């Protein structure tokens, strides 16, 4: 994989698994407000390809950037870090 370049990775929580071979992953990040110097939580939702339909809602997953697979899907689930109990 190193010869193709570094791909972006994100860690997030699965919020929806209702689509076939697709999950919606919510990724949280902290940004610092420029005026008030307070940290604010921002989140983004990404649609990710799940080949085996193995991810369930609440799972913590690692997603990696990949080629566009559809209009909205540009990420792929690499591994499930933590299962939802």
Curated annotation (Swiss-Prot):
Example of a GO cellular component annotation carried by this entry: cytosolic small ribosomal subunit
SUPFAM superfamilies: Nucleic acid-binding proteins
Metal-binding as UniProt keyword: no
Family annotation (Gene3D superfamilies): Nucleic acid-binding proteins
Alphabetized UniProt keyword annotations: Ribonucleoprotein, Ribosomal protein, RNA-binding, rRNA-binding
GO BP terms: translation
GO terms of molecular function: rRNA binding; structural constituent of ribosome
A Pfam family: Ribosomal_S17
Domain of life: Bacteria
Signal peptide boundaries: none
Assembly and interaction partners: Part of the 30S ribosomal subunit.
Protein family according to the UniProt entry: Belongs to the universal ribosomal protein uS17 family.
NCBIfam families: PRK05610.1 (NF004123), uS17_bact (TIGR03635)
Its job: One of the primary rRNA binding proteins, it binds specifically to the 5'-end of 16S ribosomal RNA.
Name this protein carries in UniProt: Small ribosomal subunit protein uS17
């Amino acid at each position: 994989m190193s010869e193709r370049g570094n791909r972006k990775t994100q860690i997030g929580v699965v919020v929806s698994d209702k689509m076939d071979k697709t999950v919606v992953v919510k990724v949280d990040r902290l940004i610092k407000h420029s005026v008030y110097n307070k940290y604010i939580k921002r989140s983004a939702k990404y649609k990710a390809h799940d080949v085996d339909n193995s991810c369930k809602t609440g799972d913590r997953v690692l997603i990696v950037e990949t080629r566009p697979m559809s209009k909205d899907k540009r990420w792929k689930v690499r591994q499930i870090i933590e299962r939802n109990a």
